[in-house]
Amino acid sequence: LLTSCGSNAEKNPKLQDPTAQTGTNAGPGVVNEKEEDEASEKAGGNAGAASTQETVITNLSDAFTGETTASAKYAAYSKKAQEEGFPQIAMLFKAASASENIHANNHKAVLEDLGATIPVVKPTYTVKTTQENLQDAITGESYEISTMYPEFIANAKSINSQLALISLNYAYKTEQKHKVLYDKALAALQSNQVKTLSMQYYLCPTCGNTYDVMPPKRCGISMTNSEKFIQIEKA
């Protein structure tokens, strides 16, 4: 779906166009990104009544608010993990925070393209223990990948809003990666194996895709060349 939307992305310089070449994903602890296309198609096919552009704008505004809040919250969770002596988990939250910011900026770019007003967001959240923060993150990601983004993607697809589909799919697929990483981190924390977690992450600047291992030549979601990736090394 995303590669077929590439020509539309070129019309909006704020939403980076994926490189149109075939790429594969690699590395342990990540989901199979090729199979995620089937999930996206399934989500798109569940649209009920025909959505209007107003519905899509509302969805994008909600997604922008959610991603902006998540970015700020994960940054705070990173600081808390560092304070509690879990630098590896602090790194994960720092990477996730940067990734969510990419999603927020993509959603914002589409809203601007649609002539919509950008919401003013004042993030509110509660910082607890690192274990509780991980559980909160897992709950949030689970909601986004099981309910929120599938619904938003279906609405955008029903009116063929291509830029919205690109931005929403980027976030939807990346959040699946984040949930895997959070599940892995929580299991490591509960089994006293935190030091086995990665201390460096690689982010795709186009879609926010997050790798805890050396990434492949191209992003498994947007096909962006990994030479452009953002490396997160210090919390």
Language model features: what each stretch is:
Residues G6-A235:
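Non-heme di-metal
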